[in-house]
Amino acid sequence: GDGECDEPESLGAISLAGRENLDNLIFVINCNLQRLDGPVRGNSRVMDEFEGVFRGAGWNVIKVVWGRLWDPLFEKDKKGILQKRMDEAVDGEYQNYKANGGAYTREHFFGKYPETEAMVKDLSDEDIWKLNRGGHDPFKVYAAYHEAVNTTNGKPTVILAHTVKGYGMGSGDGEAANEAHQVKSMEYEALKKFRDRFGIPLTDEQLKDVPYYKPEEDSPELKYMHLQRERLNGYLPSRRSDFEALEIPSLEDKAFASQMGGSKGREISTTMAFVRILNGLVKDKQLGKQVVPIVPDEARTFGMEGMFRQLGIYTAEGQKYEPVDKGQIMYYREDQKGQVLEEGITEAGAMSAWIAAATSYSNNNVTLLPFYIYYSMFGFQRIGDLAWAAGDLQARGFMVGGTAGRTTLNGEGLQHQDGHSLIQASTIPNCRSYDPTYAHEVAVIVQDGLKRMFTDQENCFYYLTVMNENYEHPELENVPADDIVKGMYLLKETKGDKGRVQLLGSGTILREVEAAAELLANDWGIGADIWSVTSFNELRREALLLEREAFLNPDAEANKPHVTKCLEGRDGPVIASTDYMKLYADQVRAWVPSDYTVLGTDGFGRSDTREKLRYFFEVDRYFVTVAALRALADRGELDRKQVGEALKKYGIDANKPNPLTS
């Protein structure tokens, strides 16, 4: 629609089609000149505007402006006066002509010049009102489609069809009126006019019930429609939900095994762990060609530039120049057979490419494994509509939020520091989201996700946060893969004889939690069970599922959610700490079987070091330690004076700014 083209997403990337020479692409824009509330361009002419925009972007433009009933008048227009009158009228006037009928049009349109007034002197007001617009003339529309389909000059084509909003409702009954979209039903007399206008075979009596009219199966109309659908290889809407299951490598295979044994003393980030897994997948003989890495001009940020030479960057034209870094190992290689989609600085464009790949199993019967990696702050916050659409379209693939965590991406300020993408991900019912800390967690989640989506064919897609902070990754004797997928597992335990607490953490803040456990043990004699929570979102969803089952089956024994089973029977209060808003961890409070304290990063980001940011947002090891001591004191298991001593010991200023409001 012409009104919808005010959305940046509608026209913002049309030059791409011109650059890619997509001469099989045809847009049809219904130019009825109206939005919901009023004219699209009341003071100008929207079709002329669109013509300029599309021609400038390298498109063919076909304008279907006037119907056949105007042709006799055009034949009379020897001096171009009618053409002049049409060119000078603005869209707000054209809306009036249709809304107010033939007499109004005779006076205000044709009546401006004697020559045009004379052209219609033999036409009745009804004849003038019936002068049709091109988009409602099947002959003109067919001619436009024929030209569009048969034009093969390497350019995409747009058809601008001039129409009337509420066409068929009748003058005075909603046609071309500003309130056309709000007319919920038509009066009986208006229905009769509609019936007569379009030749619908219903009697006056039948019309009173406003029946749904469908032509007979052997009617010319339905025969034609069925024939055309056969020529187009099927009917719409249609959704292919089943496809040939893929065999996903196991955790023992090379792509994942390299990340299961820790970092062997090296300090790496979870981003690096993810990229290594991705590199392993693209080298897989079975799956490699189906993997689609997608980046919005951030490949070097995430250490993915090695894929430029290895896989090539897709471009329709190949590479007509020698890149400036050709002498380097990881040079910028563009190729017609490239596999990396380098979309430039457009998260909406990159997300759209991801959706196309993530729905290819259904739309094209070709299963692809898309991985879209980007700055996490520029994900759901920027392209939330598209992420919601991806859920609706049953997309399957991975969205990977890089440089995640409000205090982990240091030095880039509030516009870049993400403390809420996981909360936004939780709003999409079929989006499974995780915030891993260690490489083995990343490996387990990616492998499980691939299996769920492409072997088991579950209707879901994944959001995975990865960070840019380097640290050593542990090697676990037995990686609890099932618990990692469920959202929570016991990482380690520390000893203490003066009390015990349960410490939960996710992402990079889990490492602050681990450090806090050492402080509690060494400084206060407090022991701790340390839990890695890979997904508070998954914990909550499972708990809600079981809660519903219990509600609907009151006579059956209720199953306990994973978070409850993990913490049940464990000593001490529970303290959860994350690099996200407190709401993220707080969402499981109802199923935590103990006193529950949540630390998080509510508030705007700041540009500073990680150490100072974590102090500012009150999620560093010292705040975790004091929160644990305070929780014990509230239970009467610790002298409250020790909480004050801890604040002094760790240099925590009671008068520091509140991160939520400062």
Language model region names:
Residues L11-P474, A481-D482, ...:
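Thiamine diphosphate
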Residues G3, M351, A357, Q502-L504:
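Conserved catalytic-core segments centered on acid/base and nucleophilic motifs
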